[in-house]
Amino acid sequence: MNRLKEKYTKEVVPALMSKFNYKSIMQVPKIEKIVINMGVGDAVQNPKALDSAVEELTLIAGQRPVVTRAKKSIAGFRLRQGMPIGAKVTLRGERMYEFLDKLISVSLPRVRDFRGVSKKAFDGRGNYTLGIKEQLIFPEIDYDKVNKVRGMDIVIVTTANTDEEARELLTLLGMPFQK
């Protein structure tokens, strides 16, 4: 069993049960999935840019991403409907816990001038969104092979009903929030 999942079942669940007075263990919020999305704006002019983004995302997530396509045509961006413009990957189960563990303990501390992640990035429904400016913070990415610094969005979807519950869940799992 993954280190973070073990921590969740042994420490986090009892702590949340006592703090929020849940009647049943099934009411305790848990992490449902993590979605990593990488928008590649250059893919319009340069289709090769998408291939490297897909490769990097595969290394980071440990599974193959889905290529996302444009929903509508936008003339200002020279964009046609159905053109590939990004990649996303949805992690669940073991891979999700492995990725979150790696993100919290290895990758986030490697961010330049890191003072903790924002407390305001909850969406009101108990989900947390985190923007990352460069993919180099992940240990799997080789600095020499990177042709362009790309950012990504990481969305942590939880079963929590309120932001407060979700914040408590992530704090107990070790997410470094700003003081």
Swiss-Prot record:
Q: Which GO terms describe its cellular component?
A: ribonucleoprotein complex; ribosome
Molecular-function GO term, any one: rRNA binding
Q: Which GO terms describe its biological process?
A: translation
| Matching InterPro entries | Ribosomal_uL5 (IPR002132), Ribosomal_uL5_bac-type (IPR020930), Ribosomal_uL5_C (IPR031309), Ribosomal_uL5_CS (IPR020929), Ribosomal_uL5_dom_sf (IPR022803), Ribosomal_uL5_N (IPR031310)
Please tell me whether the keyword GTP-binding is annotated for this protein: no
Q: Tell me if Ribosomal protein is a UniProt keyword of this record.
A: yes
Q: Which domain of life is it from?
A: Bacteria
The cross-references to SUPFAM superfamilies, in alphabetical order and at most eight, read: RL5-like (SSF55282)
Q: Name one Pfam family in it.
A: Ribosomal_L5_C
Sorted keywords for this record are:
Ribonucleoprotein, Ribosomal protein, RNA-binding, rRNA-binding, tRNA-binding
Instruction: Relate the protein's function as given in its record.
Output: This is one of the proteins that bind and probably mediate the attachment of the 5S RNA into the large ribosomal subunit, where it forms part of the central protuberance. In the 70S ribosome it contacts protein S13 of the 30S subunit (bridge B1b), connecting the 2 subunits; this bridge is implicated in subunit movement. Contacts the P site tRNA; the 5S rRNA and some of its associated proteins might help stabilize positioning of ribosome-bound tRNAs.
What the entry lists under HAMAP family is as follows:
Ribosomal_uL5_B
- Assembly description: Part of the 50S ribosomal subunit; part of the 5S rRNA/L5/L18/L25 subcomplex. Contacts the 5S rRNA and the P site tRNA. Forms a bridge to the 30S subunit in the 70S ribosome.
Q: Which family does it belong to?
A: Belongs to the universal ribosomal protein uL5 family.
Q: Any idea what this protein is called? A: Large ribosomal subunit protein uL5
**Organism field:** Geobacillus thermodenitrificans (strain NG80-2)
Q: Which gene encodes it?
A: rplE
